[in-house]
Structures are given as C-alpha cells and as structure tokens.
Amino acid sequence: MFKINFFLIAASILILGFSSVSAFAGQNSNYGGFYRNNNKPVKIVSGVNMPGQQLGISMLNAEHAIRYLKSEGKKYSIQIVFYGPVVKFLTVSHTEHNRLLNFLRSKGVSFRISGNALMLNGVNPKNIPHFIKIIPSGTLQIFKKIKDGYTFLIAM
C-alpha cells in the first residue's frame, strides 16, 4: 500500500511539474536559457519498454526534438534505449518499425537494446537490425546516460 501511495504522489508531482513547463515554454522560446550554450549538445536519452503507443510517442518525441533543435541551430545527441516486451517488435521482420528507426538513424539518433530483455522475451540477437547495439541492461544504460548529463525522456 505504501509503495502505491508513494508512486501516486510521485506521479502527481511529475504531472504538475510538466504541466507548468509548457506554460513557461510558451512565454520563453529559449526555455529559460536551457539551450543558450550552442557549443554543448542537447543530450536526450529515451527509454522504451512497451510496444504500441509508447514506442510511437517516443519516436515522435525524438523526431520533434530533432526538428526543433535543428531549426534553432542546436547540436544534439539522442539515444533511444529499448528494454522489456518492446524488443519482440524490433526484429528485422518488423519492416514498419525499421523504416522509422532508419529515418531517425539518418538524423543521428543512436539505438541500444537490452540483452537481458532479448533473452527474457525469447528474441534471437541475430534478428535485431545491425544498427541497434546490444547492451547488457537497458535500465543500467539509462542510468549511465543520466550520469553523463543526458535528460531522460519517457513516454507513458
């Protein structure tokens, strides 16, 4: 019970925090100076663990971020990390996802996929597109990127 209440409180704080960001962003196109330094790339890591809506929203978020950052002349580094059941939908046989992944890759997005998730979901690593790097753990990759200064973006 305590864990559920804690989760609900944390989620409420995040929702309230994000709702105020959009109002601020509308007033200040420089996002409070976040993008002021042109020499440092904007670093984003996105975690995707579910197929369907979360996967689609994460891809759209990356595309929109790239479009905005390029229009402002900003450098960026974006990595999408796949873990959990979504790995079943990232094999070479899923051509609809591969087209979108290749498009984002052409824009400089890098992809990582959890070896743990591949094993737990019965996916042969040989069936993963060559441009998606297999890593031991998706969760640990996200933690590493956060430590390296990346902003964590997750679609729910």
Give the label of every model feature segment.
Residues 26-77:
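N-terminal secretory signal peptides
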Residues 76-90:
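Acidic helix-start/capping segments at beta-turn-to-alpha-helix junctions
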Residues 51, 83-86, 116:
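Solvent-exposed coil/turn segments that connect beta secondary-structure elements
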Residues 91-156:
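A cross-taxonomic marker for long C-terminal extensions/tails that follow the last structured domain
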Residues 9-19:
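Bacterial N-terminal signal peptides
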Residues 21-25:
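Sec/Tat signal peptide C-region and signal peptidase I cleavage site
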Residues 1-10:
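Bacterial N-terminal signal peptides that target proteins for export
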